[in-house]
């Protein structure tokens, strides 16, 4: 709502931090977890949702630059566990994505900070479910009190438990009762952004 009504004015910068835990139990749970060919890496498997958010809110990118790191150095992981990505959006905004699956013990943070000419807003928490700060010209910060559960897989916890809402939308669309929330074109754009980010990865 804040973005669609342009309450922030021109968007100058957006920063997304995703610091998660994916331990040995996760990678040994399946033969595709950790495989460069089958898994693709954390931007496809864990953090595509956040790139989707960036695309949904701010549109396409002109270019991306990135650095990748392997802090855990696990022999069963064929790609990075962490990275820093700079995005140049077509609307001239600058984006930064910091991500890691090498966080100790549990998911630590999923946040987005948006800096605009008329204000700033930060949404965060473990599952990007809390307004941490909102300072916008002539605007009162909304209250969000919803508690969001996570997907618990036993040996590790996943993202926020929202998959049921997407599945329900698919069912309702097939029954001709609702409009689709998203389409494959949007999904392809997100894949292209990730491929652009990964183009510098060996």
Model-derived regions, located:
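NAD(P)-dinucleotide binding in Rossmann-like oxidoreductases
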Residues: 74-79, 91-165
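Residue-level signal for the nucleotide or nucleotide-sugar donor/cofactor binding architecture
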Residues: 45, 109, 182
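Predominantly a Rossmann-like dinucleotide-binding segment in NAD(P)-dependent oxidoreductases
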Residues: 1-76
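Hydrophobic alpha-helical segments typical of transmembrane helices
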Residues: 49-53, 162, 166-170
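C-terminal helix-rich "cap/oligomerization" subdomain common to oxidoreductases
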Residues: 90, 165-202
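Short beta-strand scaffold segments in enzyme catalytic cores
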Residues: 85-87
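Active-site rim elements
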Residues: 40-41, 153-158, 176-180
């Amino acid at each position: 709502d804040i973005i669609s009504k342009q309450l922030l004015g021109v968007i100058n910068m957006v920063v997304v931090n995703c610091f998660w835990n994916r331990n040995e139990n996760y990678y040994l749970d399946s033969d595709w977890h950790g495989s460069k060919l089958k898994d693709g890496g954390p931007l496809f498997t864990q953090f595509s949702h956040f790139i989707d958010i960036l695309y949904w809110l701010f549109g396409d990118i002109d270019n991306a630059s990135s650095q990748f790191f392997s802090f855990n150095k696990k022999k069963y992981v064929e790609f990075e566990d962490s990275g820093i990505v700079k995005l140049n959006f077509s609307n001239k905004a600058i984006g930064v994505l910091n991500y890691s699956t090498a966080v100790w013990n549990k998911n630590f943070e999923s946040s987005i900070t948006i800096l605009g000419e008329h204000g700033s807003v930060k949404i965060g928490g473990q599952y990007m479910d809390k307004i941490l700060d909102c300072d916008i010209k002539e605007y009162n910060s909304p209250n969000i009190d919803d508690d969001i559960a996570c997907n618990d897989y036993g040996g590790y916890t996943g993202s926020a438990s929202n998959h049921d809402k997407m599945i329900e939308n698919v069912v309702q669309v097939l029954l001709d009762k609702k409009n689709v929330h998203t389409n494959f074109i949007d999904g392809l754009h997100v894949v292209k952004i990730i491929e652009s980010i990964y183009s510098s990865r060996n």
